[in-house]
Design a protein with these regions (language model features):
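Conserved functional loop/turn residues at catalytic and ligand-binding sites
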Residues: 28, 41, 52, 73, ...
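Residue-level signature of catalytic and energy-coupling elements of molecular machines
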Residues: 10, 46, 70
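A short interface-forming secondary-structure element
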Residues: 51-63
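Stable alpha-helical structural segments in soluble proteins, enriched in small hydrophobic residues
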Residues: 69, 73-84
């Protein structure tokens, strides 16, 4: 691959990476637990945006259950964000980079 093509490829990859970052920033992914009593929202980068808890999920006698519900909802949302990020990164990589098969 000549240097001009390599520089062009690098520039395109940088532009595509910026667009990917914008998509990740603009996307909200949700996780829930307890039949929807606890919901967590994250952006495509995995930053926690918020947690919503219905009052029916709050039992002062069973705080551990609520803690588990929150953790489960957040983990589900984070897993969705990780899947989205990995898919977006896969789209960025050209299929024919020599010497780096199966990078993603």
């Amino acid at each position: 691959m000549d240097m001009g093509k390599l520089m062009s490829l690098q520039k395109k990859m940088m532009e595509d990476a910026e667009k990917m970052q914008e998509r990740l920033d603009a996307t909200t992914l949700d996780g829930s637990s307890g039949g929807g009593m606890v919901k967590a929202s994250v952006d495509g980068n995995g930053h926690l945006l918020g947690v919503t808890i219905q009052k029916e999920a709050v039992d002062p006698e069973d705080v551990e259950m609520l803690q588990d519900l929150v953790v489960t909802a957040v983990q589900e949302a984070l897993e969705k964000a990780e899947t989205m990020r990995a898919d977006e990164q896969r789209k960025l990589m050209p299929a024919n980079i020599p010497g780096i098969p199966g990078l993603f």
